[in-house]
């Protein structure tokens, strides 16, 4: 997993509350287990019309929001069924940071496990962020837990364990591999039959 230290990017805004995992990526696209290739299906039923043409009224399709790597959204983001495909779709689309009023617990953990930083921020602060010019680079500094724009500086908090994993780019496999020697020693001591 790529370490997350400081991220600079533009933001896309989708301030709906209670966006569930089926809205993030509909179930018909969940037939694969690779982590890539899901970005084109992100918010599929909102982004495209019945002819698979981009819906010009959907915020992510706005020309000045293309290429955004920060998503600012509403409360209870990622609710619904627990499918890791939802964070995969967000990451594959290019998002590294999701700022919401709150997240479903499993979705929050799945974001972290896939190298994305989910930030909980109150509505007043998110509304200030939303007013940032679409072309402006927003800086997200994980080490100092700060989001900076040209006019504002916002503090956020993150649990120490998740912060260390993201900062050092550690997923569950790489954490296990840190104990490879101890695991091998244990396996040598265990009786085999």
From Swiss-Prot:
SUPFAM superfamilies: LeuD/IlvD-like. Belongs to the LeuD family. LeuD type 1 subfamily. Keywords: Amino-acid biosynthesis, Branched-chain amino acid biosynthesis, Leucine biosynthesis, Lyase. GO terms for molecular function: 3-isopropylmalate dehydratase activity. Pathway: Amino-acid biosynthesis; L-leucine biosynthesis; L-leucine from 3-methyl-2-oxobutanoate: step 2/4. This is 3-isopropylmalate dehydratase small subunit. One of its GO terms (biological process) is L-leucine biosynthetic process. The gene is leuD. Pfam families: Aconitase_C.
């Amino acid at each position: 997993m790529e370490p997350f230290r400081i991220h600079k990017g533009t933001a896309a805004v989708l301030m709906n509350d209670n966006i569930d995992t089926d809205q993030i990526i509909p179930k018909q696209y969940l037939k694969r287990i690779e982590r890539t290739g899901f970005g084109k299906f992100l918010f599929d039923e909102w982004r495209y019309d019945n002819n698979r043409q981009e819906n010009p009224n959907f915020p992510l399709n706005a020309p000045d929001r293309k290429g955004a790597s920060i998503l600012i959204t509403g409360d209870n983001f990622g609710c619904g069924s627990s499918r890791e495909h939802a964070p995969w779709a967000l990451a594959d689309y290019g998002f590294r940071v999701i700022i919401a009023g709150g997240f479903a617990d499993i979705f929050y953990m799945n974001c972290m496990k896939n190298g994305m930083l989910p930030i909980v921020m109150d509505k007043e602060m998110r509304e200030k962020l939303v007013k940032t010019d679409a072309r402006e680079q927003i800086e997200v500094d994980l080490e100092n837990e700060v989001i900076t724009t040209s006019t504002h500086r916002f503090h956020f908090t993150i649990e120490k364990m998740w912060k260390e994993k993201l900062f050092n780019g550690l997923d569950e496999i790489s954490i296990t591999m840190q104990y490879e020697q101890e695991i091998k020693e244990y396996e040598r001591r265990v009786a085999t039959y």
